[in-house]
Amino acid sequence: MPSSLKLLSNLIAESVDKIEQRCAAQGVPFPELNEVLSFQSEAIRSDTDVAEAIQVIAASAAQLLATAMSPIATLSVVAHQWDVPACLGAANDANVAEILRDAGPKGAHIDDIAKRNGTNAGRLGRVLRLLASHHIFREVSPDVFANNRISSLLDSKKPVEELEKNPQSKYTETSLVNTFVSFGAGEFFKGGAFLSETLRDPVFGHSDEANHSAFNKAFKFDVSFFEWMERPENKDVLSRFSLMMRATTDLLPDAAILNGFDFGSLPDGALVVDVAGGIGSLSMVLAKTFPKLNFVVEDRPQLASDAEPYWKSNLPEALESGRVRLVAHDMFTPQPDLGSPVDVFVLRGILHDWADSYGIRLLSHLRAAAGPQTKLVVIEILLESPCRDPETSTIKGCEPRTVPEPLLANMGAADSVDYSMDMMMMGFGNGQERTLRHYVKILSETGWELKEVIHIDSLHIGPLRPHLIAVPV
C-alpha cells in the first residue's frame, strides 16, 4: 500500500490536473499569486470542479506538511503563529496596501513606505518580510515590497493621506474586508490570548454568561461584548462591527441566501422575520428578489436605528410602503405582536454568538410565537469531526460527504476557518459553532424538529453556510 506521503502528493497532483483541465476548457489561466487581485480573474474558482479540487489541495497540502515535518518543527510553527495576525493587523493599520497600490508592480522601498505612514522603517520591513514569507505581500528585491493577490484585498481604495488623517475612514462600504482583518487581528486576537486563563478559571471556565469570556479578561470589563460596543466611547468599534456584519452578506453571492430555503414558495404577503438581523442586509437581498413578501428586521435599539439610513439609501420604497419594518427588540424576550402570523423566522449567524442556555431561551420564544405553518431557517456553520462517524443521519441533506483517504473526514485545513470561528465565538462571549447532533438536540428541546439541511454549492470564497430548516412539533 502506498505511504501517506505518496497518497497525499497524488491527491495534490490529481487536483492540479483537474484545475488545469477546467482552465483549458474555459480558455482562462488560473490566477497567479504575484498578480494584483481582479475579481474577473477569480471567476474560475467558482467552477464546481475547480472549487472541489481546491478543497482537496488545501486539505492534502496541510496534512502533507504535518506528515513530512518533524513534530517539534510543527509545534514550533504553531506555537509562534501569533505573529501572523499581529503583523497583518499592523500592516493594515499602517495602510501598507494603499501605499503599495500607489507604487505599482515595481513596489516601494521600505524607507519610502515608512515616510508615508510614520513608522520605523526597519521594524515595518521585518513585519512585511514575515508576511511575505506567508505569501501576503511580496518582496520583489531586498527591502522593496509590492502587493500581490492576497495583500491587494487590504486596499481600501482610499487615498493614503486621507487614511493617515482619519484612520477610521478605512472602514467604510468600499473596504469591507478591512473590517474582518481589523477584528481578527485586533479585538478577537487580543481576547484569544486569554483563552487558557479563562478555560481554567473556576467561574468563567464553566459559565454560559456572555460577560464571563476571554474577551472580558483581556479588556477588563464586566458586560457582554455587544453591550460594551454600545458604550459611547466604543462607537467606532460598533461602527466597524456593523460593517463587518454587513460584509458577511455583501461579500457573499446572493446564492448564499437564495439557493437555500425556497423563499419563492411562500404565498404573496407572507411575513419573514429576520431575527437579530442587524441593519437587515439579508432581508435586503430577499426584499429585492421577492417583492410580494413582507419583512420585519428585529435587533437591539442601537442597531435597529442604524438600519433606517441603510434602507432609505438602498430600497426606500420598501420602508415607505410598510413592506419592510424595522423593529427594536430584545430577542431573549417574547416576540412582539407583529399583526399577522409569521411564516418564516430567519436566524443567520445568531445562535453561534451564544451558549446553549441563551440559544434555548431564544428558540423557545420563537416557538411560542410560531404557528403551524411557520418555518425556522437557521443559517450557521455545521462543524464535523476529523474522525469518520459510523452513524448516519436520516435528516434530508445530512448524508456524509465522500472524502478521499487519507484526508481527515472534515477536510482538515480546507475548512479550518470554521473551527477558528468556533474559538472566536467562545472567546468573545461564550458562544459556539455546533455539530449536526448539537443542533438536533437544542432544537428538539425547544419544540422544533430539524427536517432538512440545504448545503450551498462551494464557490471561490469557500463553502457557504448551510440552511437548517426546522418546523414546530
Swiss-Prot record:
Enzyme Commission code: 2.1.1.-
Active site: H352
Disulfide bonds: none
GO molecular function: O-methyltransferase activity; protein dimerization activity
UniProt keyword Transferase, yes or no: yes
Biological processes, Gene Ontology terms: methylation; secondary metabolite biosynthetic process
Origin superkingdom: Eukaryota
Keywords, sorted A to Z: Methyltransferase, S-adenosyl-L-methionine, Transferase
InterPro entries from the UniProt entry: COMT-like, O_MeTrfase_dom, Plant_O-MeTrfase_dimerisation, SAM-dependent_MTases_sf, WH-like_DNA-bd_sf, WH_DNA-bd_sf
Positions annotated to bind S-adenosyl-L-methionine: A276, G277, D299, D330, M331, R348
SUPFAM superfamilies: S-adenosyl-L-methionine-dependent methyltransferases (SSF53335), Winged helix' DNA-binding domain (SSF46785)
Pathway it works in: Secondary metabolite biosynthesis
Biotechnology: Melleolide sesquiterpene aryl esters are cytotoxic secondary products with anti-cancer potential. Armillaridin shows therapeutic and radiosensitizing effects on human esophageal cancer cells. Armillaridin induces autophagy-associated cell death in human chronic myelogenous leukemia as well as of hepatocellular carcinoma cells. Armillaridin can also inhibit the differentiation and activation of human macrophages and thus might have potential to be developed as a biological response modifier for inflammatory diseases.
Protein family according to the UniProt entry: Belongs to the class I-like SAM-binding methyltransferase superfamily. Cation-independent O-methyltransferase family.
Miscellaneous note of the record: Armillaria species are both devastating forest pathogens and some of the largest and oldest terrestrial organisms on Earth. They forage for hosts and achieve immense colony sizes via rhizomorphs, root-like multicellular structures of clonal dispersal. One genetic Armillaria gallica individual localized in Michigan's Upper Peninsula stands out as exceptionally large, covering hundreds of tree root systems over approximately 75 hectares of the forest floor. Based on observed growth rates of the fungus, the minimum age of this large individual can be estimated as 2500 years.
Function text: O-methyltransferase, part of the gene cluster that mediates the biosynthesis of melleolides, a range of antifungal and phytotoxic polyketide derivatives composed of an orsellinic acid (OA) moiety esterified to various sesquiterpene alcohols. The first step in melleolides biosynthesis is performed by the delta(6)-protoilludene synthase PRO1 which catalyzes the cyclization of farnesyl diphosphate to protoilludene. The orsellinic acid synthase armB produces OA by condensing acetyl-CoA with 3 malonyl-CoA units in a three-round chain elongation reaction folowed by a C2-C7 ring closure.
Record-given protein name: O-methyltransferase ARMGADRAFT_1088206
Biological classification of the source: Eukaryota, Fungi, Dikarya, Basidiomycota, Agaricomycotina
